C-alpha cells in the first residue's frame, strides 16, 4: 500500500504523512460553538474529519482524536440573555442536539471532546507564560492582548504579512491595543455579563479569548507538539494563525506538523453563512432527505473543494446511493476479512492515501457495484460493503434503505402497509387476468414514488424512488 499523503496548508503542498511517534497519530479539530443548531457547514466539517480519523485507523494507526466544544463565547452569552436562560442550560441543550445530529450522520464520537469551560486554569497558565515570554500585555481596558509583532513567524500559515494585514484587513479600532492587529487572550468582565460568563484571574474577572481556548486544550490533551490540526477553511486566518502564535510563543517549539482545512459549503456560488441568510440546519435537511444521503452528498466531493448545496445535488446523491444499495439487494456477501491485495481494495486505498480523495474512492465503489450487478459474486459484494463501510456508508440492510428511501422526506407518503395492500390488489388483478387493472396499480404506485419489481416465483418487491 502506498504511503498516506495529505495536503498541508502550512507547506502549501501534499506531503507524505510521518507521525511524530511511529504508529500513533494525535489529531485536534476545532469543533462547534454551541448556541444554535448545527448547519450544513458544520456537517461537512464533522463528516470530513470523521473520514480522516476512520482512514487513519483503517491503515493501522492508533489515533487520539480530540474535537473541542466552545461553550463560552460572546454569541453564546447574547443568546442566553435573549432567551432568559443560563449559559449552561443553553450550551447543554445544543450540545445534546449536536450529538443527535452526529449520530444521524454516522459520525463516530471523538476520543476526547473537551469543553472550553473545563480548561480555564490551563488557558490562564498559557496566558501567564506568554506574558512572561514577552508576547502578552494587559491593556488599559483590562483585556490581556497578544502582541503580534513580537512573534517573528506571524502569518506563516495564511501567507499574510503584518504589513499586508495592516494595509488590507479590516481591524476594529481599539485605542487600548498597542497594535490594531493584536488579539485578545483574556477579556475583562463587563458589569452586565450574566452568571457563568467570567472567572477569577490575576488579571481580574474575565473570560478567555476564542483563540487561546484551542491552544490550551490542544497542548494539554495532545502535548505541546502534535501531528494534525484540522478545521474549516474559514478558520485558517485568524483563528489557526493565532493558535500557532500563542502555542509556539508559550512553548518555544513547533505546535503542529500538518494543518488540514476543509472547503466552504456554497449556495449559488456564495459561501453558506448565517449573515447571508442562505444556510440550512442539519435538521432542516433531514426533514427532506435520509441522513445517509446527506453523508454521501458530502463524501463524494473532495474535502478541500467547495461543496455546492442544492436540492438537485442531494437528489442526485440519493439516486447514486440507491444504485449502490440496489447492487447489494439480492447478493449475500461472504464473511471473509478485507484483503488489501484485492484489486478494488488497492485502488480504493490508493485514492484515500492521495489526500483522502473520496471522489475517486467513490468511483471505485461504483465500478465494484457494476461488477456485483453483472456477476452477483459474494466476494465482490463483501468488498463493496467493506470499502463503503470505511466511508461510513452502506451499513444498512439494502431492502430497508430502498423501501425507506429518503426517510422523513416521505412523511405523508404511502406507508409500507398501504403499499403492500396495493401490491396484493395487483396480484389479485393479475390472477383474475385483469392486466389493465394490474398495470394501473403499478403506474399509480410509480406516480407515488414506488417502483415494483416482479421476481421469479410470483413475488413482488418494491422500493421508493
Swiss-Prot record:
Enzyme class: ligase
Placement of sequence motif 'KMSKS' region: 271-275
SMART domains: DALR_2
Sample GO molecular function, one term: zinc ion binding
A cellular component annotation (GO) from this entry: cytosol
Binding site for Zn(2+): 30, 214, 239, 243
EC number of the protein: 6.1.1.16
Keywords: Aminoacyl-tRNA synthetase, ATP-binding, Cytoplasm, Ligase, Metal-binding, Nucleotide-binding, Protein biosynthesis, Zinc
Cofactor(s) needed by this chain: Zn(2+)
Source superkingdom: Bacteria
Taxonomic classification: Bacteria, Pseudomonadati, Pseudomonadota, Betaproteobacteria, Burkholderiales
Catalysed reactions, semicolon-separated: tRNA(Cys) + L-cysteine + ATP = L-cysteinyl-tRNA(Cys) + AMP + diphosphate
Organism: Burkholderia vietnamiensis (strain G4 / LMG 22486)
Family: Belongs to the class-I aminoacyl-tRNA synthetase family.
Location in or out of the cell: Cytoplasm
Cofactor comment: Binds 1 zinc ion per subunit.
Designated name of the protein: Cysteine--tRNA ligase
Gene behind the chain: cysS
Biological processes annotated in GO: cysteinyl-tRNA aminoacylation
Amino acid at each position: 500500500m502506498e504511503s498516506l499523503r495529505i495536503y498541508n496548508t502550512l507547506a502549501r503542498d501534499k506531503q507524505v504523512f510521518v507521525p511524530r511517534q511511529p504508529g500513533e497519530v494525535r489529531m485536534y479539530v476545532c469543533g462547534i460553538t454551541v448556541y444554535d443548531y448545527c448547519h450544513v457547514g458544520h456537517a461537512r466539517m464533522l463528516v470530513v474529519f470523521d473520514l480522516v480519523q476512520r482512514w487513519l485507523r483503517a491503515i493501522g494507526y492508533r489515533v487520539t482524536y480530540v474535537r473541542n466544544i466552545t461553550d463560552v463565547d460572546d454569541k453564546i452569552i447574547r443568546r442566553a440573555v435573549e432567551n432568559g436562560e443560563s449559559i449552561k442550560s443553553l450550551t447543554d441543550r445544543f450540545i445534546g442536539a449536536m450529538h443527535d445530529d452526529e449520530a444521524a450522520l454516522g459520525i463516530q464520537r471523538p476520543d476526547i471532546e473537551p469543553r472550553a469551560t473545563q480548561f480555564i486554569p490551563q488557558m490562564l497558565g498559557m496566558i501567564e507564560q506568554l506574558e512572561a515570554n514577552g508576547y502578552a500585555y494587559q491593556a488599559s481596558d483590562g483585556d490581556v492582548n497578544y502582541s503580534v509583532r513580537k512573534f517573528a513567524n506571524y502569518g506563516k500559515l495564511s501567507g499574510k504579512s503584518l504589513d499586508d494585514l495592516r494595509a488590507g484587513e479590516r481591524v476594529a479600532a481599539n485605542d487600548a491595543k498597542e497594535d490594531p492587529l493584536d488579539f485578545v487572550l483574556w477579556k475583562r468582565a463587563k458589569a452586565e455579563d450574566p452568571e457563568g460568563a467570567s472567572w477569577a484571574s490575576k488579571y481580574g474577572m474575565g473570560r478567555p479569548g476564542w483563540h487561546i481556548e484551542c491552544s490550551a486544550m490542544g497542548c494539554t490533551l495532545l502535548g505541546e507538539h502534535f501531528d494534525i490540526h484540522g478545521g474549516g477553511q474559514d478558520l485558517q486566518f485568524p483563528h489557526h494563525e493565532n493558535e500557532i502564535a500563542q502555542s509556539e510563543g508559550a512553548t518555544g517549539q513547533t505546535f503542529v506538523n500538518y494543518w488540514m482545512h476543509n472547503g466552504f459549503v456554497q449556495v449559488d456560488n456564495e459561501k453558506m453563512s448565517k449573515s447571508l441568510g442562505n444556510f440550512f440546519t442539519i435538521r432542516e435537511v433531514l426533514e427532506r432527505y435520509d441522513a445517509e444521503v446527506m453523508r454521501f452528498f458530502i463524501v463524494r466531493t473532495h474535502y478541500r473543494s467547495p461543496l455546492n448545496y442544492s436540492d438537485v445535488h442531494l437528489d442526485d446523491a440519493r439516486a447514486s446511493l440507491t444504485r449502490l444499495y440496489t447492487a447489494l439487494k439480492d447478493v449475500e456477501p461472504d464473511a471473509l476479512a478485507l484483503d488489501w491485495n484485492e484489486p478494488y481494495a488497492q485502488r480504493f486505498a490508493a485514492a484515500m492515501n492521495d489526500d483522502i480523495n473520496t471522489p475517486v474512492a467513490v468511483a471505485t465503489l461504483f465500478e465494484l457495484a457494476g461488477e456485483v450487478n453483472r456477476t452477483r459474486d459474494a466476494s465482490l459484494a463483501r468488498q463493496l460493503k467493506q470499502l463503503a463501510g470505511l466511508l461510513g456508508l452502506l451499513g444498512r440492510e439494502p431492502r430497508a434503505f430502498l423501501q425507506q428511501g429518503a426517510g422523513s422526506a416521505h412523511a405523508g407518503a404511502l406507508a409500507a402497509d398501504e403499499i403492500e395492500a396495493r401490491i396484493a390488489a395487483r396480484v389479485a388483478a393479475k390472477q383474475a387476468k385483469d392486466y389493465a387493472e394490474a398495470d394501473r396499480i403499478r403506474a399509480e404506485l410509480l406516480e407515488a414514488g414506488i417502483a415494483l419489481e416482479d421476481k421469479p416465483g410470483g413475488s413482488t418487491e418494491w422500493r421508493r424512488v
